């Protein structure tokens, strides 16, 4: 029998703006939602809240713009920071959605083994206790939305999962 994913706690409700509107105000609200949802989910695991790093915001925004301009979905080659990426098409996206999608990978993570799992890498980076700061970027084109989050120090370090990816409290 397939396991049903756990419900994701909604951090808030909001009416999404019009699709494809890549305005500064829309992006600031969106990125605040990304940040708030990230810290809410980390808190459920007893992990400290991340702080926003302006340089990581810039790096994440540049990569989100690059992905939009290439119409691609790929990780930055040889990143210095942890990175989660998200692409959605055909629907309005709020800032909590990408974070909640990454969090759903909890279903693929084995807390007993406490090691990297390719199907849970976004979740483990999101929760990684040793990460202290983050930066996010969002880019839109037509009905597509790209989201990039960078984390410092990076997570998913071999041999450190047991100490950095705690189960829910």
Where is each model-derived feature located?
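Membrane-targeting and insertion segments and their boundary/processing signals
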Residues: 16, 30-34, 72, 106, ...
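Disulfide-stabilized extracellular recognition modules
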Residues: 78-81, 89-169
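Poly-acidic low-complexity segments
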Residues: 7, 26-27, 52-55, 110, ...
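Low-complexity, intrinsically disordered flanking regions
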Residues: 1-19, 169
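Intrinsically disordered, low-complexity regions enriched for glutamine and histidine
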Residues: 10, 19, 73, 120-123
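Short, well-ordered surface patches within globular domains
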Residues: 20-82
């Amino acid at each position: 029998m397939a396991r049903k994913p756990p419900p994701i706690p909604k951090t808030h409700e909001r009416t999404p703006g019009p699709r494809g509107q890549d305005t500064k105000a829309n992006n600031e609200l969106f990125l605040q939602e990304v940040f708030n949802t990230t810290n809410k989910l980390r808190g459920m695991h007893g992990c400290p809240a991340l702080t926003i790093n302006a340089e990581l915001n810039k790096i994440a925004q540049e990569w989100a713009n690059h992905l939009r301009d290439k119409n691609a979905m790929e990780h930055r080659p040889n990143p210095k920071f942890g990175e989660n990426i998200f692409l959605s098409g055909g629907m309005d996206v709020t800032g909590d959605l990408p974070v909640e999608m990454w969090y759903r990978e909890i279903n693929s993570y084995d807390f007993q083994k406490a090691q990297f799992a390719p199907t849970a890498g976004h979740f483990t980076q999101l929760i990684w206790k040793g990460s202290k700061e983050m930066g996010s970027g969002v880019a839109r084109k037509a009905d597509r939305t790209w989201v990039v989050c960078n984390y410092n120090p990076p997570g998913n370090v071999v041999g450190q999962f047991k100490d950095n990816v705690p189960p829910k409290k």
